[in-house]
Amino acid sequence: MPYDKKAVHFGGGNIGRGFVAEFLHNSGYEVVFVDVMDSIIEALQKQSSYTVTEIGDDGEREFTIDHYRALNSKHEMDKVVQEIASADVVTCAVGPNILKFVAEPVAKAIDARTLDYPIAVIACENAINATTTWRGFIEGKLSEDSKSNLDKKARFANSAIDRIVPVQDKDAGLNVKIEKFYEWCVEQKPFENGGKKPDVKGIHYVDDLEPYIERKLFTVNTSHATAAYYGHQAKKQYIHEVLQDKKLHDIVRDAVKETAHLIVSKHGVSVQEQNDYVDSIIKRISNPVLKDNVERVGRAPLRKLSRKERFVGPAAQLAERGEKVDALLGAIEQAYLFQNVEGDEESAELAKILKENSAEEVVTKVNGLDKSHPLFEKILPIVKKVQGGS
């Protein structure tokens, strides 16, 4: 089947296959996967299709994803560049720390691009303004000619994505189980004045992305991670088990009550609307059908404890406003206790940092706060307590 639209997607993982590629495929795009994992690319090259199963309260729905191709960027970089140079859209779901490694092929493709409209560049990461970050890495590798007329060659749009992908069955192969709920918001201003807005069913284009990013990150990710870190200490296996425990359920609620206060006061969202949103999120992450593993949700604690992330991000803004942050501080303490968890490098690195640095150095290094910030003095005793093992 010939396609008149093409999207290149970096990252053949569950979010890439089960969310981004599903939407692109269902919107009539031929999808070209790019990854460095030999096993994923070989499987995609061998199999002509895979299944995405959406899990909801009302049961399951299956979708077949086909008519895709796959390239290994370790061995086929020239082909990757050619594909991007002739694509309508390039997306990624590789993890915020990997963005710098997927910049060069995009830069080379922009340099080589001869089409009379710009490619749309959209990062689909759990991070604020990830496309802007990716753009910085890409621009650092562009020719001077491309830099001088970049608007004609590429448009960069930040996005906010929200969809829970639970731990997959061991024998799932390429098939992905994913929750039915989704949100994919993309800023539309970058596509004005000569840009070509991707026609993707399910994307919600918005003028100002920040309220959507912060609402999602400081509600979904904050509640999810709070449940995971408290659940890990309570020896729970799944997130829904954490939330079935009334004491832990109330603790998670308290954390997102604090972030809700920020969302309402900063972005002008009504109290009722934010409360309804919080209720819907707690219901989502409480779904036992997802079998959402506590250790999976808790992994990468260093990133999750960083300055603009789900705990310190909202807590810092609230502290600057003189508002209450007690529940968020509790979650931060639990995150600091997520150390030396099997299969998670960051949890081992966190333990090392706590062992080798003073409490002041830890707060600066891990949380990105200097001593003058009002949150610094609130986190400092937590770190001292964790270091002391009390």
Curated annotation (Swiss-Prot):
Keywords: NAD, Oxidoreductase. GO terms for cellular component: cytosol. Monomer. It comes from Phaeosphaeria nodorum (strain SN15 / ATCC MYA-4574 / FGSC 10173). This is Mannitol-1-phosphate 5-dehydrogenase. It is an enzyme of class 1 (oxidoreductase). The gene is mpd1. Catalyzes the NAD(H)-dependent interconversion of D-fructose 6-phosphate and D-mannitol 1-phosphate in the mannitol metabolic pathway. Required for the process of sporulation on senescing leaf material. The keyword Oxidoreductase applies. It holds the Pfam family Mannitol_dh_C. One of its GO terms (biological process) is mannitol catabolic process. Transmembrane segments: none annotated.
